[in-house]
Every structure is written in C-alpha cells, then in structure tokens.
Amino acid sequence: MGLPGKNKGAVLSKIATNNQHGENSEYFDGWKAYDKDPFHLSRNPHGIIQMGLAENQLCLDLIKDWVKENPEASICTLEGIHQFSDIANFQDYHGLKKFRQAIAHFMGKARGGRVTFDPERVVMSGGATGANETIMFCLADPGDVFLIPSPYYAAFDRDLRWRTGVEIIPVPCSSSDNFKLTVDAAEWAYKKAQESNKKVKGLILTNPSNPLGTMLDKDTLTNLVRFVTRKNIHLVVDEIYAATVFAGGDFVSVAEVVNDVDISEVNVDLIHIVYSLSKDMGLPGFRVGIVYSFNDSVVSCARKMSSFGLVSSQTQLMLASMLSDDQFVDNFLMESSRRLGIRHKVFTTGIKKADIACLTSNAGLFAWMDLRHLLRDRNSFESEIELWHIIIDRVKLNVSPGSSFRCTEPGWFRICFANMDDDTLHVALGRIQDFVSKNKNKIVEKASENDQVIQNKSAKKLKWTQTNLRLSFRRLYEDGLSSPGIMSPHSPLLRA
C-alpha cells in the first residue's frame, strides 16, 4: 500500500512523517513477532507466548456472570431494548450523569474508600492513551518538558509526545535503591532541564509503577506534591493500576495526599489524575479513560477536548449499572487482588527455579525480571538486545527489554503474567527453566569473566561507565523513535 509519486512525504503533515510515534522499538517489535506466530495450546504449541501485554484476564469470568445476571444493563437484550432510542441519540459530551457518578464511586472504592471523587470533575476519554494526551494538551505547549522517573511505560513517547510536541526528560532511578524515586532525583532532573534552557511544566508518575509493579509510599508522594508546589509545575499521576495491589499494604492515591496535607503546602490546581478501567477491571476493549483534575480550568478544557475521544453511550450505560452494584464491585476487587497474588507467586516461584530473580513488587500485572547474569556484557545495551532476540526467536516468549522503558541499566526485562490461562503460564515457565538449564555452564563462565572485569576496574572508571551509559541512554531515547507505519489491529500501539 502506498501513495503515488516519488516524494510521498511532501503530501503529508509533519506529524505523519516525524519519527516520534515510537513504533520502531523492541517493545513493539515483540508484538509484531507474536502477531506472526501466536502461541496456542493445541493449534500452535510451538508459537510465541505473549508476555508483553499488560492485560488482566484473571477475573473476566466474574464480569461475564454479572452480564448474564443483569441483561437489562445492555440495550442489546430483550430486557434492555426499551432504552435503545434514548441511548442511540446524541448524548452530552460530558458523559451520562449516572456513568460519571458510578466512575467516581468506583474510583473511591478502588482506593480503599479513604477518598471520594467529585463526578463533576470526571472527564471521559478513549482509554488512558487518550486521557494522557488530553492532559498534555491542557497543560503544555510544544517544546515544554515533563519529567518522568525511569524506567517508565514504553508507550509514553507516543501518548505524551507524538502529537503534542511535548518533550520528556527521564529521572534516572537505580537498582541499587530498588528503582525508588526520590525528591533529590527529581530535583537533579529539574536542574538539568533548566541548564538546557528547557521549560519544565510538570512531573509525571505512574503509581503503581509500570513496569516495576511497585507503589509510592505516602511520605514520598507527599514530598513530591510539595516539590511540584515549590517549583510551580504540574503533577500528573497515572493511577490505572490502583486496584491491582495484591500484597504489602494499601495503595495511596495522590487524591488522599491532597486531602491530608496542609493546605499551605500544596497548590491543588497543579494536581491531576489519569485513570481507566483497562487494568483494574480488565476491560481495555471498552476504551474507558478518565482525566480527573482539581483544576477547574483543566476540567473545562478537557471536557471540550473529550469530543475527540468519547466513550460510547452503550458502554457508559452498562458500566454505570455494573459499577453501581456495590456487592459486585466489592467482591470483584477482593477476588481480583487474591487471584493476582496467586498468579504472581506462581510466576516468581517458577522463575526462581531457574535462578532468576525479580524486583520485589506488590502490584501490577507484571514483574521486573533481572537477567543481568545472562548478558554477554553486563554494561552493554547491545548485549541486552542480543538476549532479547534469543528469548523471542528461540525461547519463543515475547518479553520487553528494559531499554524500551528507558531503563539506564542493561539486563532488566518486563514480563506480564496476568494475560494468559494457567496452562499457558505453565508452558512459559517450562521454556524459561529449560533455556536457563541448557545454558547454565555458559552463564557461570560468563559471570566469572564479568566478575574479573569488575574487580579490575577502579571506582573512577565505574563512575565514568555509569555516566556514559546514561549518555548512551539519552542518545537511544533521541534516536530510537521511528516514523509511523501501518499497524496490526492487535498492536499495543492501538491499546491503552
């Protein structure tokens, strides 16, 4: 498929021809490989298993049961067809009132009932992808900068930058401190941006973190709220994994911090939340994204922009009924947390048998897997990509390399465990264990060689190497974004 003429770019816009969509990365290449050879237990048992999709399929049976028991919630049933004419007509772009009320109520429940949300501040969007872009259009102009702790969600370059012209500066976080974000690190990145004459408009967090599966504690979140208030920059918190916590305490929303912190220490007009039902409810196909802002002007602007990415009225109607069913919601959230905890334990126990460790986590639909000991060169991103190719081509697993998430240390991989049935997970774990077992001698020899190299390096040389890695990472960030192309309908480029 192509356009006539030799100079195809001449008839297209700058957005259509720029290199900022982000499709040409290993994160998306893994999806393309999977699309060509998808695993199936019986039809294609030697195919690639999809472990690059952060999708929550563990409780779809509960939703199916609710739909069967509540046929009146849909206009596509005999019990609900009487609502068809009303729902089929144009609706308020702000959304059905009962839908916004139900969403606000559910957001409170997903955060343990410790905070309430105002339905009038709920703005709809087509998934979290649309919500993230909408908030960027509301807050920033082309060339403005947002700081984001790295590693961060691989598709943020698309969601936040591609059409808005906003720039991202990573806030590097280290494995030596379990990739924890500190105010000092944010301050460092802020100063670096200023030294480059960049206008910093805000800080973006994912909490719980994608890809780490960790949560920010209340003290850290409070200090970051104070930080953005001092700098007079925005704080956008992506909380789409709020209800995926399965251990280690309660999730703390930035809304809870706003309620508890002294009013003199926070400018609430700077605080914004992105949410969706894709992860917590396992409904990415419903395309329900939410912008929730404490700033009246942002709410007003986002409402106007929502006309470009509405949630269908039919979807709103059914979800308004489902999310208003307190008994169902309470049971769903409890059971989802329980099943995620079991699945996480099964996965981490399975890879531990292969002498593979993960970052300690308690939320999300994935694990941050440490494969540094399998690298040919532990200081090389090239070695990381070599290993990734082996995992894709030989082990037949689509996992995502850390460099796709702008991690500054080679050898970390995100691997998703909630998007498959138990039998498929068993096959995936078997493949991992078999691969490590067959290559164990090579791994031991490689580790010995790496240890000797490290011992021979001075502290000064190590410091230089770490700095050089960050510079290499920056070049990777600037050069590794590709022009858009024609995408598979199953591509994550089209998903939240």
UniProtKB/Swiss-Prot annotation:
Belongs to the class-I pyridoxal-phosphate-dependent aminotransferase family. This is 1-aminocyclopropane-1-carboxylate synthase 2. Phosphorylated on serine residue by MAP kinase (MPK6). May be processed at its C-terminus. Substrate binds at E55, Y93. Homodimer and heterodimer. In vivo, the relevance of heterodimerization with other ACS enzymes is however unsure. Interacts with GRF3. InterPro entries: Aminotransferase_I/II_large, Ethylene_sulfur-biosynth, NHTrfase_class1_PyrdxlP-BS, PyrdxlP-dep_Trfase, PyrdxlP-dep_Trfase_major, PyrdxlP-dep_Trfase_small. Pathway: Alkene biosynthesis; ethylene biosynthesis via S-adenosyl-L-methionine; ethylene from S-adenosyl-L-methionine: step 1/2. The keyword Transport does not apply. Optimum pH is 8.2. Induction: By ethylene. By indole-3-acetic acid (IAA) and cycloheximide (CHX). GO terms for molecular function: 1-aminocyclopropane-1-carboxylate synthase activity; pyridoxal phosphate binding. The gene is ACS2. The lineage of its organism: Eukaryota, Viridiplantae, Streptophyta, Embryophyta, Tracheophyta.
